[in-house]
């Protein structure tokens, strides 16, 4: 995540620094301040937070088993969790059915796309979901939501050409309930600028009165940064907002500012959008989020995602092989097959403890595309059993040339796969070295 990635780099630098401890603390505090301010976090919040970290790091003795640097990381973890909302677990499972969710937000926040993502998320949990296209303001909103509903496997209701958003919302909720929907998600219009915001808030009130939603969800673009504070308060005053979704966290340096600003209002962030694909939405849990920021990883989120797929046991077996250091091309083959189902490899790696701090030095080979994965699978299909079991045989040029001819690729592409194998093996070796540190953090309740 742009901006916030600098926090991970600050921690990585901290763990490598040498010299007097007070100097190390001061340098880390400066790096952390720069990272948070560049992420558009309120300057006053940043200086208060870093002041508390510095004072405790220099005055308090770390618990038995932790070095002073590790204690500094733990203090940073605790303060960032507070900054981004504290220790709470959002309840995403509806308390009863049918359950009506009304989506609100300004135009351009990614609201309609988020309706599709939510529909897909709840379909994945086994609920029957329906969506209502009540945005009559934006051209193309009806067609966009219809396509998203199809992709999500959700029921759809809309009235193309109608200019009566309140009536559409009321009739849509009634019909989808009759069709057996457990969850009904209503998309409403957004507006640009302060001049049109009053009209938006008035329409929002009228729709809420007509459909009596069980939950109102405010969608906020992460690029708003600190401005999210005022927006969240204005919407909440118009219609009580039950939860908030912060979108486009992958595309802006201001994500930290948006998250901290929303948390400062006391509102609960339930989900964050992490990409453009319909699957790229995740439950926002401050503790896990901060653990990933610091490079500690988020195994629980990763495991949740894996559980929604087939072949969980096979995946776990592959991960165990990789963690043990016994990596061959057979391991890489299985890993590439499975990761294509999970999403971009770098996003998966960021969830694994210890790996995210290494991504900066990871070879370009690890930046996988779907096209590259297919090509590499073809290359491995052209290898002998001996080569699959002993990748170092590819040091021989004659083997590289033979494999390239068999796969219909250039020798340089075979060497690229070999370099990828070496970078993964190196990464796993580094990860094993950090295992003790992670276990000690876990015992302290940090992750």
UniProtKB/Swiss-Prot annotation:
SMART domains: AAA, SRP54, SRP54_N. SUPFAM superfamilies: Domain of the SRP/SRP receptor G-proteins, P-loop containing nucleoside triphosphate hydrolases, Signal peptide-binding domain. Part of the signal recognition particle protein translocation system, which is composed of SRP and FtsY. Archaeal SRP consists of a 7S RNA molecule of 300 nucleotides and two protein subunits: SRP54 and SRP19. GTP binds at residues 105-112, 187-191, 247-250. One of its GO terms (molecular function) is GTP binding. Its main location: cytoplasm. This is Signal recognition particle 54 kDa protein. It comes from the Archaea. Involved in targeting and insertion of nascent membrane proteins into the cytoplasmic membrane. Binds to the hydrophobic signal sequence of the ribosome-nascent chain (RNC) as it emerges from the ribosomes. The SRP-RNC complex is then targeted to the cytoplasmic membrane where it interacts with the SRP receptor FtsY. Composed of three domains: the N-terminal N domain, which is responsible for interactions with the ribosome, the central G domain, which binds GTP, and the C-terminal M domain, which binds the RNA and the signal sequence of the RNC. Keywords: Cytoplasm, GTP-binding, Hydrolase, Nucleotide-binding, Ribonucleoprotein, RNA-binding, Signal recognition particle. GO terms for biological process: SRP-dependent cotranslational protein targeting to membrane. Belongs to the GTP-binding SRP family. SRP54 subfamily. Its EC number is 3.6.5.4. Pfam families: SRP54, SRP54_N, SRP_SPB. The keyword Signal does not apply. It is found in: Cytoplasm. It catalyses: GTP + H2O = GDP + phosphate + H(+). It comes from Hyperthermus butylicus (strain DSM 5456 / JCM 9403 / PLM1-5).
């Amino acid at each position: 995540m742009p901006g916030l990635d600098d926090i991970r780099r600050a921690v990585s630098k901290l763990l490598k620094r040498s010299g007097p401890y007070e100097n190390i603390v001061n340098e880390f505090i400066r790096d952390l301040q720069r990272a948070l301010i560049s992420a558009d976090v309120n300057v006053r919040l940043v200086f208060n937070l870093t002041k508390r970290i510095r004072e405790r790091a220099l005055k308090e003795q770390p618990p038995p088993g932790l070095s002073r640097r590790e204690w500094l990381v733990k203090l940073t973890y605790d303060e960032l969790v507070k900054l981004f909302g504290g220790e709470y677990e959002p309840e995403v499972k509806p308390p009863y059915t049918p359950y009506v969710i009304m989506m609100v937000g300004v135009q351009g926040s990614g609201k309609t796309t988020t309706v599709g993502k939510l529909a897909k998320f709840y379909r994945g949990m086994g609920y029957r979901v329906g969506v209502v296209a009540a945005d009559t303001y934006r051209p193309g909103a009806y067609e966009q939501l219809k396509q998203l509903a199809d992709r999500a496997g959700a029921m759809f209701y809309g009235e193309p050409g109608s200019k009566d958003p309140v009536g559409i919302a009321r009739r849509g909720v009634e019909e989808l309930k009759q069709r057996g929907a457990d969850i009904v998600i209503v998309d409403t219009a957004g507006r640009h600028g302060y001049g049109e915001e009053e009209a938006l808030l008035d329409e929002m009130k009228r729709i809420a009165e007509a459909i009596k939603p069980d939950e109102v969800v405010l969608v906020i673009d992460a690029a708003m940064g600190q401005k999210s504070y005022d927006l969240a308060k204005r919407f909440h005053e118009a219609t009580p907002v039950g939860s908030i979704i912060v979108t486009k966290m992958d595309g802006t340096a201001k994500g930290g500012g948006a998250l901290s600003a929303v948390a400062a209002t006391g509102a609960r962030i339930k989900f964050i959008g992490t990409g453009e694909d319909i699957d790229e939405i995740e439950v926002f849990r401050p503790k896990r989020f901060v653990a990933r920021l610091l490079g500690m990883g988020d195994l629980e989120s990763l495991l949740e995602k894996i559980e929604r797929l087939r072949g969980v046991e096979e995946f776990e077996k592959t991960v165990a092989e990789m963690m043990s250091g016994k990596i061959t091309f057979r391991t890489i083959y299985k890993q590439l097959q499975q990761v294509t189902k999970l999403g971009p490899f770098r996003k998966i790696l960021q969830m694994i403890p210890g790996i995210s701090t290494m991504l900066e030095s990871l070879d370009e080979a690890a930046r996988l595309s779907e096209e590259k994965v297919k090509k590499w699978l073809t290359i491995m299909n052209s290898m002998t059993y001996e080569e699959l079991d002993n990748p170092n045989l590819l040091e021989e040029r004659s083997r590289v040339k033979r494999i390239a001819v068999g796969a219909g690729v250039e020798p340089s592409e075979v060497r690229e796969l070999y370099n990828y194998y070496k970078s993964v093996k190196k990464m796993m070796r580094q990860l094993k070295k950090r295992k003790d540190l992670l276990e000690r953090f876990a015992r302290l309740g940090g992750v």
